[in-house]
């Protein structure tokens, strides 16, 4: 059992150094193919997964032991979440004209089932920004956008990635600031 833990720790160490190298590859692909929404999606996924899986994990573990180092990890992850958010807004804008404005106004968009990963990863980057900023109001205002994105995705494909959309939506309901007293019950 101990050896598998060491192997996992070793693998995590490799990922910590290898994944940021892939960011340069993603940026190059975006530069060379800036009208292809898939390159933005792939870059966003990498940024978000690295931020949650490596940086936020380290920050959370260090928060009460080495506050200033933890803050540095949160700050770095926030920067990556914001870049990921920007990539996903760009990707969805390529797929749906005036996407960002429509999202802010919660207007109807004719999303397709192929949009589900885009909606999910945009909501994930927004949620990550809230978490990494420790609830900074500048990012907290995205809670309604996260809910809107996930609700639209669930309508399209409720079983996507074995219920990942519902798992994400539970967090939204549990952090609902709208005053809806049934919000927690809806989540459960």
Segments (PLM) and residue ranges:
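Charged, well-structured binding/catalytic surfaces in domain cores that contact anionic ligands
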Residues: 160-161
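Ligand-binding pocket scaffold of soluble enzyme catalytic domains
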Residues: 153-157
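Short coil/linker segments at helix-helix boundaries
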Residues: 5-28, 32-35, 46-152, 164-188
